Amino acid sequence: MSKIDRKAYADMFGPTVGDRVRLADTELWIEVEKDFTIYGEEVKFGGGKVIRDGMGQSQASCADTPDTVITNALILDHWGIVKADVAIKNGRIATIGKAGNPDIQPGVTIEVGPGTEVIAGEGQILTAGGIDAHIHFICPQQIEEALTSGVTTMIGGGTGPATGTNATTCTPGPWHIQKMLQAGEAFPMNLGFLAKGNASLPTALNEQVEAGALGLKLHEDWGTTPAAIDCCLTVAENYDVQVAIHTDTLNESGFVEDTLAAFKDRTIHTYHTEGAGGGHAPDIIKACGSDNVLPSSTNPTRPYTVNTVDEHLDMLMVCHHLDPNIPEDVAFADSRIRKETIAAEDILHDLGAFSMISSDSQAMGRVGEVVCRTWQTAHKMKVQRGPLAEDSSYSDNFRARRYIAKYTINPALAHGIAHEVGSVEVGKLADLVLWKPAFFGVKPSLIIKGGAIAAAPMGDPNASIPTPQPVHYRHMFGAFGRACTGTSVSFVSQAALDAGIAASYQLERRLVAVKNCRSVKKKDMVLNHYQPVMEVDPETYEVRADGQLLTCEPAEVLPMAQRYFLF
């Protein structure tokens, strides 16, 4: 058999088993664990290449072949890091395997036909579209910003730049829920809306879930009392929807122990569980040790840097409608920003005790930075703590799988949508993102939404080729018309689906009911299910997990930052 040297092979077909790939300009390296190809039988499109009639392309009918095949992509997902061809059919991932023409090639599991489009994945990393589960829907322009960062599902609440939305992730009341579902039809993004959950009696909460909310949100600015927590979780149990909570920073109606007791062992998603984004001061971070608590971070504290504390004070005053001239408001802001708990948050992510990362968009978080800040955190921990026990000095596969799970499969599991999205797995929506390794986590090269290309960096439309400047992200055909409504979904409660809101609201896009929201537990958070016994010193704010002091230095320089951005 003819041989080719490893570098030439990687240049032609992408890395193979044993090769390592650096993620952007971080100190993180991933190693190819498996390659589905058969050496010498790789398929590649182009002039003089393999995918031509009678060669790598068969004569099979369109019914028997995929709509699209992504060739030779390096898949990075929670379940592994493998090289494969990926077939897409009817907007879903159909096969992960070996593409080609079975009439002349061995081992083909994806038959390429005349009806098959090709996306070249050689030398690129393929991930699932990100899921941002903490969105303040303050402006619709957030959606394009998120999409072009690699996010394809947004969950949260809001009605636009209303004062309530600026502070809380709630879409309150059936009328607003209807309007937000109708507005969502225009965007190439899966959407789900959280209704206001702050009530001590269930009637209004029932009405909102039945109107189309996929879950409920408890926020301290609306009064997150033990009575409201208990009522909200009782309604959620009845409808199988998730509850997200921003707890009581001021400890007005109880302390963290009272809030945990009000949960009564029922599952809940705790937003910004460190506390800078809000929550019992100074010890809401303790919640990450409970089996029924699904803890997440928001990205302004990811990772801990020399600028984190100073930046947060001004952000908090604006977002929560506070007055710098009122001493009590300033004290409220000061109580939430603690360098000790923010530093501990870095380590708790690295240990897998914090399970998810989201944005808190325009309300102390940046909607386009969920992906890059996740990987900045992973990099900082690699530099400061060294390889994880499951990794080696050669590669960081386990750490990479742990961190990608934080914005893909785990928020999907937490909110009952993992049967549709959250991973590169057969049967799920083809919400996929391609990255050149040098730009991984920063600037995607292609965003595929429900099997259609929704956005990509594109050059001058009047140029003779696609690449001349100015190159910037633009919506592609998958973002327009009925292609847009046909390739994205809105997530709602089963009760809303049964009530027929699709017809009564005159919605075109597919509605999908969330499920298994009440049975998911911390142990189900993939690669992020550590439940330490947490202690916080009320005077010094020192944090301990299972008796170990958690502290680290702030970063002075980060990768995936000014090297890639002008602004």
From Swiss-Prot:
GO terms for molecular function: nickel cation binding; urease activity. Substrate binds at residue 219. The modification N6-carboxylysine is found at residue 217. The active site is at residue 320. Its main location: cytoplasm. PROSITE patterns: UREASE_1 (PS01120), UREASE_2 (PS00145), UREASE_3 (PS51368). It comes from the Bacteria. Ni(2+) 1 binds at residues 134, 136, 217, 360. Its EC number is 3.5.1.5. Its cofactor is Ni cation. GO terms for biological process: urea catabolic process. The keyword Translocase does not apply. Carboxylation allows a single lysine to coordinate two nickel ions. Keywords: Cytoplasm, Hydrolase, Metal-binding, Nickel. Binds 2 nickel ions per subunit. It catalyses: urea + 2 H2O + H(+) = hydrogencarbonate + 2 NH4(+). One of its GO terms (cellular component) is cytoplasm. It is found in: Cytoplasm. It is an enzyme of class 3 (hydrolase). InterPro entries: Amidohydro-rel, Metal-dep_hydrolase_composite, Metal_Hydrolase, Urease_alpha_N_dom, Urease_alpha_subunit, Urease_AS, Urease_asu, Urease_asu_c. Pfam families: Amidohydro_1, Urease_alpha. Heterotrimer of UreA (gamma), UreB (beta) and UreC (alpha) subunits. Three heterotrimers associate to form the active enzyme. PANTHER family: UREASE (PTHR43440:SF1). This is Urease subunit alpha. The gene is ureC.
